[in-house]
Amino acid sequence: MKKEWNDIIIRDAVPSDAPVLCRWWNDGAVMAHAGYPNGLGTSVEEIEKQLSPNSRFRHIIIYKGTPIGEMNYIPADETSCEMGIKICESQYQNKGLGKKTLSLFISGLFNDLGYTKIMLDTNLNNTRAQHVYEQLGFTKIRVRENSWKDQLGNWQSAVDYELTPKNFKSYI
């Protein structure tokens, strides 16, 4: 899926994106909310292998010609999918780009791909993301207390969200 709006482009990730993904995925500051405060410890070669067959589900966010983050979606069934986003370059965080990028991506999932429900989860400590999701119309379904351990063995809690087209509030 490729989506464009103003200076934002969301496009399928390709093997040549592996070096930037590797930098992001090995950065503990970027990956901490996903449970990897020390980063993933992966290689460019490993990421290239992952991207070759599955790149239609992983996407790169480009802003004014610069890769700034990634998004993905995974079909859950014929009518619903799970999705995720990371604005990985810190200088582009807290500028409203996440909300606009999510609006663009979600409109594609609903309007272009025909999904009728989008699900996601986030770390309970990631209140900034929760605020954005709720502004977009996501409904908090549940909090899963101490439901998983991060790579340091610390218990983490997650918040599950769902969004339907009826509740979606676009910011583009």
Where are the predicted features?
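Conserved GNAT acetyl-CoA-binding A-motif
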Residues: 111-121
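Conserved acetyl-CoA pyrophosphate-binding loop and the N-cap/start of the following alpha-helix
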Residues: 92, 96-105
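Terminal substrate-recognition subdomain of acyl/acetyltransferases
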Residues: 153-172
